[in-house]
Structures are given as structure tokens and as C-alpha cells.
Amino acid sequence: MKNLFEKLNYKGNKRIALLNSEDRFINDISIEFNDLTIDREIDPRFPYDFILVFAKKIADVEKYTPVALHNLLCDGVLWFCYPKKSSKKFKSDLDRDHGWKILNDSGYYGIRLVSIDEDWSALRFRYVKFIKSVSGRFPR
């Protein structure tokens, strides 16, 4: 799990938001990082440096994006995990290129893709003004 969190740009934050996750994922993280506070719902009074959202459908992206963006620190780390097309466990209307309109409309674009496990991929979103090399790919 530590290697995965390194890939996800986890920088040792003491408190993170992990939304809509399976219990097994929470348990694995809790065992590996026993001094980490994991919020399963956004605390509206807390600004997060690291938010990880599991979304099985576009509806999940639309549900969790507003609250995640509201509580994400300036240039905080925001990941959305979604089912792989090859997953035998999940079927989804999300993929690397589709289902992220609400994030794109808010100025957030997918910049990095990481494999979580056999069922999940994770896509990191970053606000356009913090993306170093845009080369016409993203609107400014």
C-alpha cells in the first residue's frame, strides 16, 4: 500500500479524505498508516491536501466533485478511481477519456493515470493553472 500511495503523490499528510471506497481499501490503508486520519465523508470545515474518490459511474463523479473541490486546498492532490474496462467485478460508464465533464468545466483536467489493482484505475486531476505543460491540450 505504501508503494501505491507513493504513486498517488501522498506526502505524509495526517488527514485525508477517502470517499465512496470499499471497506477493504480503508482497512489496508489503516493497517499500513496507523497514524493517519481517514475521513470517509468530507468535513466541510477542513481543507484537504489529499482527496481520493472512488466512482463507479458518472453519477458518482457528479455527486462527489462539488464537495471535493470546495474542500481541496489550492493545488491539493485530487484522484478519482474508476473501474477498469477489464474488471470482472464492475461495469462502468467511466473511462480515461469519458465522464469527467463536471471536473473539466471547473478547470480540472486529468494529468496522470495509475493502476490501483485488477479492478481500479486512478486518474489525478489538477487545476489548469497549475499544469506546467499544457501545449494546447487544455483551455487557459
Where are these regions (language model features)?
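A short, conserved alpha-helix within the catalytic core of class I
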Residues: 58-66
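Flexible, glycine-/basic-rich loop-and-beta segments that form/coincide
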Residues: 128-140
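Short glycine-centered segments of the SAM/dcSAM-binding site in methyltransferase folds
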Residues: 15, 76-77
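Short, charged/polar "capping" segments at the starts of alpha-helices
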Residues: 23-29, 87-90
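Conserved class I S-adenosyl-L-methionine
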Residues: 8-21
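Short acidic low-complexity segments
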Residues: 37-48
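Helix-to-beta-strand junctions that scaffold the AdoMet/dcAdoMet cofactor pocket
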Residues: 72-74
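C-terminal substrate-binding/active-site "lid" region of AdoMet-derived donor-dependent transferases
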Residues: 81-123
